[in-house]
Curated annotation (Swiss-Prot):
Name listed for the protein in its UniProt record: ATP-dependent Clp protease proteolytic subunit
Subunit note: Fourteen ClpP subunits assemble into 2 heptameric rings which stack back to back to give a disk-like structure with a central cavity, resembling the structure of eukaryotic proteasomes.
Gene3D superfamilies, sorted: 2-enoyl-CoA Hydratase, Chain A, domain 1 (3.90.226.10)
Subcellular localization(s) per the UniProt record: Cytoplasm
Principal location class: cytoplasm
Superkingdom field: Bacteria
One GO cellular component, as annotated: cytoplasm
Catalytically driven reaction(s): Hydrolysis of proteins to small peptides in the presence of ATP and magnesium. alpha-casein is the usual test substrate. In the absence of ATP, only oligopeptides shorter than five residues are hydrolyzed (such as succinyl-Leu-Tyr-|-NHMec, and Leu-Tyr-Leu-|-Tyr-Trp, in which cleavage of the -Tyr-|-Leu- and -Tyr-|-Trp bonds also occurs)
Active site (record annotation): 97 (nucleophile), 122
Organism name: Citrifermentans bemidjiense (strain ATCC BAA-1014 / DSM 16622 / JCM 12645 / Bem)
Lineage: Bacteria, Pseudomonadati, Thermodesulfobacteriota, Desulfuromonadia, Geobacterales
A GO molecular-function descriptor: serine-type endopeptidase activity
Gene label: clpP
C-alpha cells in the first residue's frame, strides 16, 4: 500500500511527512487492520512518544480493525492504561474482537463511534496442534484469557460478567447506537459533532 505524503510550508521551507507521521503531530494514532505484535509495537511506541511529549494532553486512537492476536491487543491496552495521557478511542468502519475491546478501554466519556461503524465482540479464538498434554495446557490458557477479557469488558461497559460471557459466546454485532447502549462507547460522532452522550 502506498502511504500518502503531506507537504507543509514552514518558516524554514518545505517539510514532508508520511500521512501517519503528520497525524501523530496532532496526537492522532490510526490502528487500521489486524492486530499482531508488529502493529502493537508501532501503536505502543506512538503512545509512549506522545506521553513523553505531553502527559496531560489527550491522545486520539482511531480504530478500524477486525481484531487480532489477544496478547498483542493486551499489550496496547495495558499501555493505554499505563500512561497518564487520556486516550480517546474512535471507531471508524469497524472495531471487532480485540478492536472492540480496545475501543471500550478508552478514557470514560471519550469513547466514540462514527454513525455507520459496526462493533463486534466474541470470545478469544485459538488453535494449537501437538501432543494432548500441550493442547490441554493451551486450552486452559485460552479459557483463562476468556475470563480475563470478560471481566475487563464488564468493567468498562458496566454490564455484568455473566451477561458479557453469554454475549461473547458467539459473534455479537452491534451498531454504534447499540454499542452505546451496551456501554462500549459513550457517544456517536457526526461531522465532528457528538450525539447521544456527554461532551
Amino acid at each position: 500500500m502506498l502511504v500518502p505524503i503531506v507537504v507543509e510550508q514552514t518558516g524554514r521551507g518545505e517539510r514532508s511527512y508520511d500521512i501517519y507521521s503528520r497525524l501523530l503531530k496532532d496526537r492522532i494514532i490510526f490502528l487500521g487492520g489486524g492486530i499482531d505484535d508488529n502493529v502493537a509495537n508501532l501503536v505502543i511506541a506512538q503512545l509512549l512518544f506522545l506521553e513523553a511529549e505531553d502527559p496531560d494532553k489527550d491522545i486520539h486512537l482511531y480504530i478500524n480493525s477486525p481484531g487480532g492476536v489477544v496478547t498483542a491487543g493486551m499489550a496496547i491496552y495495558d499501555t493505554m492504561r499505563y500512561i497518564k495521557a487520556p486516550v480517546s478511542t474512535i471507531c471508524v468502519g469497524q472495531a471487532a474482537s480485540m478492536g472492540a475491546f480496545l475501543l471500550s478501554g478508552g478514557e470514560k466519556g471519550k469513547r466514540y463511534s462514527l454513525v455507520n461503524s459496526r462493533i463486534m465482540i466474541h470470545q478469544p479464538l485459538g488453535g494449537f496442534q501437538g501432543q494432548a498434554t500441550d493442547i490441554h495446557i493451551h486450552a486452559k490458557e485460552i479459557l483463562r484469557m476468556k475470563d480475563q477479557l470478560n471481566a475487563l469488558l464488564a468493567e468498562h461497559t458496566g454490564q455484568s460478567v455473566e451477561k458479557v460471557a453469554a454475549d461473547t459466546e458467539r459473534d455479537y454485532f452491534m451498531s454504534g447506537e447499540e454499542a452505546k447502549n451496551y456501554g462500549i462507547i459513550d457517544a456517536i460522532v457526526t461531522r465532528n459533532v457528538v450525539t447521544g452522550g456527554a461532551n
